[in-house]
């Protein structure tokens, strides 16, 4: 059987390479967990039939769902395998079949097992977006259809404060937003407002259910507020996210770093166009206690990046272009040199995460697209990374997928539940046809059940006739919704019984380990360079090397995928 024939029947195997969408990125299958000649496949005349690939074992001893012959792309590897799901969690990665007659079976299929055909598909962990302004609930539909299954941030709707800052302020708003979370088929976690100089206003938000606190310059990110916020976070094992002081009113970047006192913190849009000490906030990604992320409008650097940012900034931060001071504030944040350096710092693993900044200088449905566009641009401009060769870009792929899966999960204390494809974790999985990888998922599985899929005319005789578009599936309806999605809260809130007190239906999961995670824990993205930004030219130097690149004029994963 030729390699081509085998791939067409069972999907790629060890040594086969796959192009990701229309990029220059190639991944190569490193290992195949299935056994040649013993593969399982569903369909007429195929293997998964009673007494053949399907066993006589009862429901307790077989998988609820098996994704067959899929290529898994995760931070830990690129492998071909069958994926077992049981009780909404990933149960095993291995070889599925009938253990009574087949060798090497680690996943038993029975009459209780549903099959999702993974032949020829790539499976990734559900994306995690940690910079969400909850301005409109319709963001969730867009995010889920893009492959994001967890959203972390703050807000209360299109209030002026939420339009600018990712904060759900105070216990009353926190309770209302946690109640609203019950209506959406996605994992959610909310950040309280961290700008206060005394502990009580912050502690009461954690007790109300916040998984962390957000410091934002629009509320006054002073050294006193930073110190107090981090002290409360240390006491409650929650994370702090920060948007630093663009105007340098309360101090320069050195004063902010000093206020951290070596404590863990997540820096949003660390390049600075989204906000932060001008012009050198980028320096903080060399700190051991700083977990740096980007937001997607600057990803990657293109010929249009600078032009679109000014108007975005004026709207999002309630500025008036007719006021000279407001205009100067906006222009101070937009620097071609630091945006160009941001591309390279991502490629070298100094910037650890990527998120959206939804409707507040960011696009909620483009986290995954822009991550892979950045990876493509860097391969074209900088060549292979150390660890990759001429045949594949496996290490680069692992580095970039980690930026929106495992690293944000580690940062916000939810990696024990989500963020990777590993046994025991919540079965949030995204299935992609390689030609549409990173752009348009074929199917999104939430908590082991199909939540969203590309589906044709419901009145047609088969599932595929046009119009084919994303439609919500049964995991988004009735009681299934609350049993296939999670709401993350603080341990303090869980112990206080907010689930019963608020009347919540979703399972509440406490965050943990938020205060012990450091930059060295950021998988494939742990580089800590010494960075200097020239205050006059804005040139960025990391460990003595000037970081600069040209803007892209054309990108993959763009217009050809969005004709309609």
From Swiss-Prot:
Subcellular location: Cytoplasm
GO cellular component terms listed in the entry, alphabetical order: cytoplasm
E.C. no: 3.5.1.5
Residues the record lists as N6-carboxylysine modifications: 214
Top EC class for this record: hydrolase
Note on how the cofactor is bound: Binds 2 nickel ions per subunit.
Classification via Pfam families: Amidohydro_1, Urease_alpha
Source taxon at top rank: Bacteria
Assembly with partners or alone: Heterotrimer of UreA (gamma), UreB (beta) and UreC (alpha) subunits. Three heterotrimers associate to form the active enzyme.
Protein name per the record: Urease subunit alpha
Species, as recorded: Burkholderia pseudomallei (strain 1710b)
Gene field: ureC
């Amino acid at each position: 059987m030729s390699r081509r024939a085998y791939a067409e029947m069972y999907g790629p195997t060890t040594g086969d390479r796959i192009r990701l969408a229309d990029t220059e990125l190639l991944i190569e299958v490193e290992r195949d967990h299935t056994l040649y000649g013993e593969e399982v496949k569903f369909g007429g005349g195929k293997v998964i039939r009673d007494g053949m690939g399907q066993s006589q074992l009862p429901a307790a001893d077989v998988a609820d769902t098996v994704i067959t012959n899929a290529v898994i792309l995760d931070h830990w590897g690129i492998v071909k395998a069958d994926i077992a799901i049981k009780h909404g969690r990933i149960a095993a990665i291995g070889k599925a079949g009938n253990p009574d007659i087949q060798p090497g079976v680690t996943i038993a299929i029975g009459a209780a097992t549903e099959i999702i055909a993974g032949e020829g598909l790539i499976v990734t962990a559900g994306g995690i977006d940690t910079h969400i302004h909850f301005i409109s609930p319709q963001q969730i539909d867009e995010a889920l259809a893009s492959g994001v299954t967890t959203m972390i941030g703050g807000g209360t709707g299109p209030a002026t404060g939420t339009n600018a800052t990712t904060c759900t302020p105070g216990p009353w708003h926190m309770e209302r937003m946690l109640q609203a979370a019950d209506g959406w088929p996605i994992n959610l976690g909310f950040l309280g407002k961290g700008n206060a100089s005394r502990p009580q206003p912050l502690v009461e938000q954690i007790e109300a259910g916040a998984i962390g606190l957000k410091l934002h310059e629009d509320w006054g990110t002073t050294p006193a507020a930073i110190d107090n916020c981090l002290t409360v976070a240390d006491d409650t094992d929650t994370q702090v996210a920060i948007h630093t002081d663009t105007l340098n009113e309360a101090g320069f970047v050195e004063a902010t770093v000093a206020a951290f006192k070596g404590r863990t913190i997540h820096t949003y849009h660390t390049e600075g166009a989204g906000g932060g000490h001008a012009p050198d906030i980028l320096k903080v990604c060399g700190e051991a206690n700083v977990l740096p992320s980007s937001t997607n409008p600057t990803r990657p650097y293109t010929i249009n990046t600078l032009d679109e940012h000014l108007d975005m900034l004026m709207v999002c931060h309630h500025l008036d272009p007719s006021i000279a001071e407001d205009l100067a504030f906006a222009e101070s944040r937009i620097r071609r040199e630091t945006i160009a350096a941001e591309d390279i710092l991502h490629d070298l693993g100094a910037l650890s995460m990527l998120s959206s900044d939804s409707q507040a200088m960011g696009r909620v449905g483009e986290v995954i697209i822009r991550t892979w566009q950045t990876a493509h641009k860097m391969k074209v401009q900088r060549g292979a990374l150390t660890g990759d060769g001429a045949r594949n870009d496996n290490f680069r792929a692992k580095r970039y997928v980690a930026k929106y899966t495992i690293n944000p999960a580690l940062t916000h204390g939810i990696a024990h539940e989500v963020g990777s494809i590993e046994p025991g974790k919540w079965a949030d999985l995204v299935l992609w046809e390689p030609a549409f990888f990173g752009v348009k998922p074929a199917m999104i599985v939430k908590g082991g059940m199909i939540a969203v899929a590309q589906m044709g005319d419901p009145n047609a005789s088969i599932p595929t006739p046009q119009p084919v578009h994303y439609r919500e599936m049964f995991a988004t309806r009735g009681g299934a919704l609350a049993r296939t999605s999670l709401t993350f809260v603080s341990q303090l809130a869980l112990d206080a019984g907010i689930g019963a007190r608020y009347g919540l239906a979703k399972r509440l999961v406490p965050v943990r380990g938020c205060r012990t995670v450091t930059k060295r824990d950021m998988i494939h993205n742990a580089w800590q360079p010494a960075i200097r930004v020239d205050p006059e030219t804005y040139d960025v130097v990391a460990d003595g090397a000037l970081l600069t690149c040209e803007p892209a004029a054309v990108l993959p994963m763009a217009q050809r995928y969005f004709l309609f």
